[in-house]
């Protein structure tokens, strides 16, 4: 992204791509659970549902109402339930209920890519850059909202920590994850050091993932995110 003059574009997955995958799995005797990015952020969920119409009882689509690592931990939870011996229908029922307990929050390092994507004006981006403004965002009811803004990375990190503390506590019996964008996890490691008290006995072995191209395109490098189930 840093080396690109133009911002890459993102697009949804077509029904035909889903149908090809469904047919292959069902023909092999498998039952399929599809967990998608929030339907409020992408048309991919609708594509998955359209393709599933001919596979009733064999393909189940779950709208995660989330994205990136928030979507990831819902999938990981589904795999936990499968190992416990639940049927596909039972897993889907639990995921539909538990997805509302996921908190996904992030700290952005720059406003530049929100400007390039047309989500904020060049003037706002310029002023924010001059003042070292760091936005803190979250996925709420399937949409990305601004929780607040902080001046400087340290204040931004503290803001994110306070927002996590406001939640009902991390349920460590379920999957959780920290993530970052860019080629370096330096900012994430600083955040982990500052927020070590939040992760209790897991601080030295935290699951970490990159946030992926779709979200990374919109937020730019240097973003830090957390996703967890509340108690």
Task: Enumerate the predicted regions with their spans.
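Short coil/turn segments at secondary-structure boundaries
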Residues: 12-16, 174
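Mixed-charge interfacial surface used for oligomerization/domain docking
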Residues: 4, 30, 40, 44-60, ...
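N-terminal glycine-rich anion-binding loop in soluble enzyme alpha/beta folds
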Residues: 1-13
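N-terminal glycine-rich phosphate/adenylate-binding segment common to multiple enzyme folds
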Residues: 17-45
């Amino acid at each position: 992204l840093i080396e690109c003059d133009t911002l890459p574009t993102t697009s949804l997955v077509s029904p035909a791509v889903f149908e090809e995958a469904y047919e292959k799995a069902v023909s092999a005797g498998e039952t399929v659970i599809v967990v998608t990015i929030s339907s409020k952020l992408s048309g991919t969920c609708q594509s998955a549902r359209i393709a599933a119409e001919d596979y009733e009882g064999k393909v189940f689509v779950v709208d995660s109402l989330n994205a990136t690592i928030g979507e990831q931990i819902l999938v990981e939870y589904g795999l936990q339930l499968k190992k416990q011996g639940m049927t596909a229908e039972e897993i889907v029922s639990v995921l539909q209920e538990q997805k509302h307990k996921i908190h996904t929050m992030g700290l952005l390092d720059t406003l530049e890519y929100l400007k390039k994507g047309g989500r904020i004006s060049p003037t706002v981006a310029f002023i924010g850059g001059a003042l070292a403004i760091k936005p803190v965002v979250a996925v709420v009811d399937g949409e990305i909202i601004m929780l607040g803004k902080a001046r400087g990375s340290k204040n931004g990190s503290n803001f994110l920590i306070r927002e996590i503390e406001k939640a009902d506590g991390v349920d460590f019996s379920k999957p959780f994850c920290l993530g970052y964008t860019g080629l370096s996890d330096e900012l994430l490691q600083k955040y982990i050091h500052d927020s070590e008290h939040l992760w209790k006995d897991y601080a030295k072995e935290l699951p970490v993932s990159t946030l992926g191209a779709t979200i990374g395109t919109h937020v730019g490098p240097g973003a830090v995110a957390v996703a967890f189930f509340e108690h």
